[in-house]
Amino acid sequence: MSEYTKQITRLISEVRSKKPLIHNITNYVTVNDCANVTLAIGASPIMADDIDEAADITSISSALVINIGTLNKRTIESMILSGKKANEKGIPVIFDPVGAGASALRNETTSTILDKIKISVLRGNLSEISYIAGRNASTKGVDASEADIQSNDSIAVAKAAAVKLGCVVAVTGAVDVISDGKNVVTVLNGHKMLSNVTGTGCMTTALVGSFCGAVKDYFKAAVAGVTVMGISGEIAYEAAGHKGTGSYHIAIIDAISRMDENIFGEKARINEI
């Protein structure tokens, strides 16, 4: 195990010992799963999204997670108010721009959030982050494997978005890439069955938020959150993949709840580029 992986591994105990309160303003498709993975990794979730209390809840939280999976005007207002309060209090903001590039409302909301709120970590898939970075991800190439193409695209896009926004960026996919614009880490953990369960990206963002609430190094926090989901996807497949996606879904949360430094250290495939 590399020294860097050892440093990331120790963050598991940090979250479980500190039990940070994580404020999630997320979508109604995955809100229950996001709350459960936050609990499973050792943090404490609160899912308040009403405009009359959202900023107050943020002010007593250790991190704010904003997810635009299901949008409405009132929730958008809550996101902006909470984000501003987090910035005022020095609380990290983790942003998941679900579907950015897909509709005018999502594009406008993404732009508004990025204009009005200082983001600590941006987590999305290659398409979403490419849109934000103003780049088109390459999908061509006959000699490279699909994973290699995705990795190369993700590295370029993650670095570009990180430089543009001045934050940590995590692009998740077949190969996960985390960058702050200068440093780059790839995570090779995960299983293709994760894509058959709705909300695994949202859950990953919630995990990143949980780590950001416990440690001030948001780059390492992002690496830890992404890796925990990847490892848990692998463990869940071994335990329940043959049973179908429902059992696999539950097994992911089970695996996160059992995650410790020994499991993480043994299975993590983290590479500094």
From Swiss-Prot:
<feature type="binding site">
    <location>
        <position position="47"/>
    </location>
    <ligand>
        <name>substrate</name>
    </ligand>
</feature>
<comment type="similarity">
    <text>Belongs to the Thz kinase family.</text>
</comment>
<dbReference type="GO" id="GO:0004417">
    <property type="term" value="F:hydroxyethylthiazole kinase activity"/>
</dbReference>
<keyword id="KW-0808">Transferase</keyword>
<dbReference type="GO" id="GO:0005524">
    <property type="term" value="F:ATP binding"/>
</dbReference>
<feature type="binding site">
    <location>
        <position position="123"/>
    </location>
    <ligand>
        <name>ATP</name>
    </ligand>
</feature>
<keyword id="KW-0067">ATP-binding</keyword>
<keyword id="KW-0547">Nucleotide-binding</keyword>
<keyword id="KW-0784">Thiamine biosynthesis</keyword>
<keyword id="KW-0479">Metal-binding</keyword>
<dbReference type="InterPro" id="IPR029056">
    <property type="entry name" value="Ribokinase-like"/>
</dbReference>
<protein>
    <recommendedName>
        <fullName>Hydroxyethylthiazole kinase</fullName>
        <ecNumber>2.7.1.50</ecNumber>
    </recommendedName>
</protein>
<dbReference type="GO" id="GO:0000287">
    <property type="term" value="F:magnesium ion binding"/>
</dbReference>
<keyword id="KW-0418">Kinase</keyword>
<keyword id="KW-0460">Magnesium</keyword>
<dbReference type="Pfam" id="PF02110">
    <property type="entry name" value="HK"/>
</dbReference>
<dbReference type="GO" id="GO:0009229">
    <property type="term" value="P:thiamine diphosphate biosynthetic process"/>
</dbReference>
<comment type="function">
    <text>Catalyzes the phosphorylation of the hydroxyl group of 4-methyl-5-beta-hydroxyethylthiazole (THZ).</text>
</comment>
<dbReference type="GO" id="GO:0009228">
    <property type="term" value="P:thiamine biosynthetic process"/>
</dbReference>
<feature type="binding site">
    <location>
        <position position="199"/>
    </location>
    <ligand>
        <name>substrate</name>
    </ligand>
</feature>
<feature type="binding site">
    <location>
        <position position="172"/>
    </location>
    <ligand>
        <name>ATP</name>
    </ligand>
</feature>
<comment type="pathway">
    <text>Cofactor biosynthesis; thiamine diphosphate biosynthesis; 4-methyl-5-(2-phosphoethyl)-thiazole from 5-(2-hydroxyethyl)-4-methylthiazole: step 1/1.</text>
</comment>
<dbReference type="InterPro" id="IPR000417">
    <property type="entry name" value="Hyethyz_kinase"/>
</dbReference>
